[in-house]
Structure formats: C-alpha cells, structure tokens
Amino acid sequence: MSKDKKNEDKETLEELKELSEWQKRNQEYLKKKAEEEAALAEEKEKERQARMGEESEKSEDKQDQESETDQEDSESAKEESEEKVASSEADKEKEEKEEPESKEKEEQDKKLAKKATKEKPAKAKIPGIHILRAFTILFPSLLLLFVSAYLLSPYATMKDIRVEGTVQTTADDIRQASGIQDSDYTINLLLDKAKYEKQIKSNYWVESAQLVYQFPTKFTIKVKEYDIVAYYISGENHYPILSSGQLETSSVSLNSLPETYLSVLFNDSEQIKVFVSELAQISPELKAAIQKVELAPSKVTSDLIRLTMNDSDEVLVPLSEMSKKLPYYSKIKPQLSEPSVVDMEAGIYSYTVADKLIMEAEEKAKQEAKEAEKKQEEEQKKQEEESNRNQTTQRSSRR
C-alpha cells in the first residue's frame, strides 16, 4: 500500500509540474472543497446516528410509560416511531443522492476551469463618455486638416463661370463688372455672394443679378437687363433710354432698331428720368400710341411737352403731370373726327390741327409784324442819331 501511495504521489507531482499555476490553484481549490464536503457528510452522518439513538431511547421510555395506557395510545406511538424511521430513511436517501450530485458539481467545475484556460479573457468595454470626448477632439482636427489641404490645393481657386440672360451686354462685361478674379477662392464666392451680385448690378444695363453655385466648381450668373423704353434721336443717331432712366452714351445701328419705337427729342438727364418715371405709370396701350416726345415750354409751364401720337393727334401736357392727365386722352379720342390737338396745360380742351396751323400762322404773322416794327424803330433811331451827328458837325464847322 505504501508503494502504491508513493507512486500516486509521484504521478500527482509530475502532473502538477505540467499544469500551469492557475490550474494548480484550481485543483487545490477543488481538493479543499471535496475535503470540506466529505467532512460535512461525516458530521451529518454522525448527527443522524445520534438522532436515531436518542429517538430509539425516547421511544423505549415512552413505551414503558405508556404500557399502562390504552391500546390506542400504543398504536399512535408506533405510528410516530414508524414515521420517524421513514424520515430517517428519507434523510439517508437524500444524503446518498447529494453525494453523486456533489461529484457531478466537482466534474462540472473542472470542465469550467478547463474551458476558462482555453478561452481568452474578454476585453474590457470602453465607456461611452470617453468615446464622445475622443470624437469631439478628433472630428474638428480632421475637419481642419481637410480644409487646410483643400485651400492649399489648386482646386480651391478652380471656377467655371457662365453668364445667362444678356441681350444688350456681353458675358465679358458682366464678368468684369463682377470683379471676380482667377485667384479668388471658391469659398469666398459662396460666402460673399451678395457682394458680387451688387458689383454686377453696377453695370447700368443690369436690373438684377443672381450668382448660382453648382457642385463642385460651376457658377452661373443669371442676369436680368433693363428694358429699352425709348430712343433719344440726335440727327441720324439713336441712343437707347433704359427703364432705369439711364441714357446710353453709345448709339445703336439703324438695323438693330425695332419696327416701332418711341422717339425722344431732348436729352436732359433729369427730364429723362422724370419722363421714364411718369411713362411707367401709363397703360401699355397708351404707351404704344405715342410716337414722338419733344419739349414745348410756354410762358406759364416750363416743363410742357408735346406728344405726337401714331394717329397724328398731338397732346400738350406738363411733364410732371403726364401720368395723371394723359389717360384722359383715351376718353377724348372717340370725339375727335380729324387730327386734333389736345391741350392739357391748364384744363383740357381740343382743337383741330388745321386750326392749330392757322393759329401758328397768325402767331408767326404777329411775330413778324413785331419784328418789322422793331426794325423800323431801330432804323428810325439810327437815322435820328445820324442826323444829330450831322448837325453837330455842321455847327462845329461854322464856328
């Protein structure tokens, strides 16, 4: 027996050497646990035997004492003793069942220990707050790096600029007015859109401008030009008058003129602005009926103008009151049977063109008569002066 024990001890030592420290600790723990369970089982067995002895002694004492009692009491005592015996047997059975269960638990613990040695330890999870802090630092840094790299690259100044809506102007004129340079950053155009749109509107032809961006580098300048409302005529030259009240300084070719247009025979900048402003308040039908506008100041009204209509009618109206008084012409027109003059200087009345010619002829005759009288008076004065001079010379010669 001693040899067998020695051999077993040697084998266990060799196994312990081969095992890792953790496995050694695990085996030691399992051995201790098995020893403790065996000790507990022995204590339980001793307690059970002691209980059985006490119960048997008590039952004997009771039997002696109860021998004098009725038969019914003896039967009940027997039943109680039988129940106790049955309970003791049940305790034995439970203990017998617990022993294999404890062995099974030991085997399961060994298996779990082996699995734990094979499995790798689980990685600790990173708390969410640390991830959030790292994100708040890394994201701005990466964004700044990306923006810096973009600004240093040639893509930062790459632009494809197109112009739409030009009729009287050219795309080059619009680009020049915008002030956009090849060296300007694309991001500056996006951030300062309003500034560039305002610069484009510095071109007097442009009524409105819109700078539209399309990814990645395309820009479209959408332009709306002022309309041409009339032409200032000087000899054979025609200068456009815009709806803004601006008079174009360069004339247009006769081939580019529309079939019908409004002719203006004065070029004062303030008067043209007032005329365009008043004209904008008149209906399109009445505008289309006007053929020519010229100044016709009188002694009473300095800004009186004469409008020659397409049907040969003439309208005299103050320039500052044109939008108020001219619409009445549409009501008077059906009453005119022949070309007439509608005078709106003070009140409204009309007369025929023939009467006008007669009146003009009479006025011319009066003016000519006045001029003739003036000439006669001047000649008489000259003659009197000459006669006076002659008399003075004669007197001086006599002396």
Curated annotation (Swiss-Prot):
Belongs to the FtsQ/DivIB family. DivIB subfamily. Residues 156-226 form the POTRA domain. This is Cell division protein DivIB. Residues 389-399 have a biased composition (Polar residues). Residues 1-133 are cytoplasmic. It comes from the Bacteria. Residues 35-65, 75-119, 364-388 have a biased composition (Basic and acidic residues). One of its GO terms (cellular component) is plasma membrane. The gene is divIB. InterPro entries: DivIB, FtsQ_DivIB, POTRA, POTRA_FtsQ_type. The lineage of its organism: Bacteria, Bacillati, Bacillota, Bacilli, Lactobacillales. It is a single-pass type II membrane protein. Residues 1-23, 35-119, 364-399 are annotated as: Disordered.
